[in-house]
């Protein structure tokens, strides 16, 4: 398992489109290379321009993706709630990221 702590994603923004066609901007907080263990990569996103709430928390969304054959990033997929091993790995990497920052 590897992850890209050295990549500064603070200014990378992507647009997600929901089922109703609404577009929302998100900033990439962290990418995680989980190909060795799970065969896919992960990305942690925060709504663009979001601020911490009164309790110091901020909404973070996690998705998985696989690279296309041409090397481009594929579509984002929700991570199944019952995939404990994946969530444990994401939490471990995220906590390490927080400790480093």
UniProtKB/Swiss-Prot annotation:
What Pfam families does UniProt report for this protein, alphabetically? DUF1292
What are the annotated disulfide bridges? none
Q: Which family does it belong to?
A: Belongs to the UPF0473 family.
Q: What is this protein called?
A: UPF0473 protein SPy_2112/M5005_Spy1795
